[in-house]
């Protein structure tokens, strides 16, 4: 029997999940649940309202929650966990412990299993950090993001008065990447290691100097970063910045014995951030389904799912072909 999937929300991430489910031999998409009325899905799967969610209890094995981290998932993941096993991509790193505790309480009471903070960071990058630090306990870890579009930062710029549209790219500084690859351990954090590159379409009568200042002084987004603001036309933005690429690097530079150095590097280059994140969610939905079948309840992360459980291959096939 196929794993029955539901999707909550229908933005770019949800469409990425929808596309990935179509590629899976052991899954079927039951429906999309949205606050918006009358939407049409790419695959033609039926759409329902958020109020319909409880009616599908027992008809969906895993709900994939595709809302934003700032306001949606904080509320929606615990709410939907009352009825279903769920997976989300909650990515506000500082609030993960709080989100985990809230979801864990609900899931244990409901006897459901929910996996939070899945994707590529948090998610795939999180796993690589743990592997690298376990293998090289004496060393230093680094994470770089980009070059890619930061959707949250782009949205933050678009909320500024006088801004019609915007894209913000996170760009890793190459000098630090090269130093680490050479076995060095530079003193660099996320702020120092990245450039924030902004492309902004301003209204004709907007005060561009004021907009630039608002961007550069925005707490939790741009303060502390080297930030460059470029004002361009809507035509230029549509022509040159229409995609949603992203990527990044996890590196660890360390020693096994004095003077014997090793560098571990894991990298991603993504044409579409939401499509890749959606693909990760779908793979881990399979792992979560299997965990729940083994009696798991409560809240989990990618650290808790055995790699074999996210694969469509049997244990025998994995040993024969991937080990």
PLM-predicted stretches and their roles:
Residues 4, 15-16, 23-53, 149-285:
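C-terminal substrate-binding/catalytic lobe of Rossmann-fold NAD(P)-dependent oxidoreductases
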Residues 124-140, 155-165, 287:
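Oxidoreductase and adenylate-handling cofactor-binding alpha/beta cores
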Residues 53-62, 70-89:
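Rossmann-fold NAD(P) dinucleotide-binding segment
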Residues 10-11:
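Glycine-rich Rossmann-fold phosphate-binding loop(s) that bind the pyrophosphate
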Residues 90-114:
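Rossmann-fold NAD(P)-binding glycine/threonine-rich loop
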Residues 88-89, 114-118, 144, 167-168:
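General beta-strand structural signal in soluble alpha/beta enzymes
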Residues 258, 262-323:
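NAD(P)-dependent Rossmann-like dehydrogenase/reductase catalytic/cofactor-binding core
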């Amino acid at each position: 029997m196929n794993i029955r999937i539901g999707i909550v929300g229908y933005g770019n991430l949800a469409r990425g999940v929808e596309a990935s489910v179509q590629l899976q031999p052991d899954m079927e998409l039951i429906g999309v649940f949205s606050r918006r009325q009358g939407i049409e899905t790419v695959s033609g799967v039926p759409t329902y309202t958020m109020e319909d969610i409880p009616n599908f209890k027992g008809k969906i094995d895993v709900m994939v929650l595709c809302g934003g981290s700032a306001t949606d998932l904080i509320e929606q993941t615990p709410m939907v966990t009352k009825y279903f096993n769920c997976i989300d991509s909650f990515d506000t790193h500082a609030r993960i412990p709080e989100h985990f505790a809230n979801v864990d309480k609900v899931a244990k009471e409901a006897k459901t299993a929910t996996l939070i903070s899945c994707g590529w960071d948090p998610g795939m990058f999180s796993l690589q950090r743990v592997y690298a630090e376990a293998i090289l306990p004496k060393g230093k870890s680094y994470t770089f993001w980009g070059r890619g579009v930061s959707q949250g930062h782009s949205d933050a710029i678009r909320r500024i008065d006088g801004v019609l549209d915007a894209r913000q790219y996170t760009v890793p500084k190459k000098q630090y990447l090269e130093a680490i690859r050479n076995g060095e351990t530079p003193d660099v954090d996320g702020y120092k290691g990245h450039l924030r590159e902004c492309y902004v379409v301003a209204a004709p009568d907007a005060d561009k100097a004021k907009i630039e200042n608002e961007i550069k002084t925005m707490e939790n987004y741009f303060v502390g970063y080297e930030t460059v603001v470029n004002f361009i036309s809507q035509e230029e933005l549509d022509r040159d910045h229409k995609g949603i690429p992203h990527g990044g690097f996890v590196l660890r530079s360390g020693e096994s014995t004095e003077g014997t150095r090793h560098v571990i590097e894991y990298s991603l280059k993504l044409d579409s951030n939401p499509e890749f994140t959606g693909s990760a969610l779908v793979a881990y939905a399979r792992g979560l389904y299997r965990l729940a079948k083994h009696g798991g309840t409560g809240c989990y992360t990618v650290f808790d799912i055995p790699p074999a459980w996210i694969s469509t291959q049997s244990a025998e096939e994995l040993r024969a072909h991937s080990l």
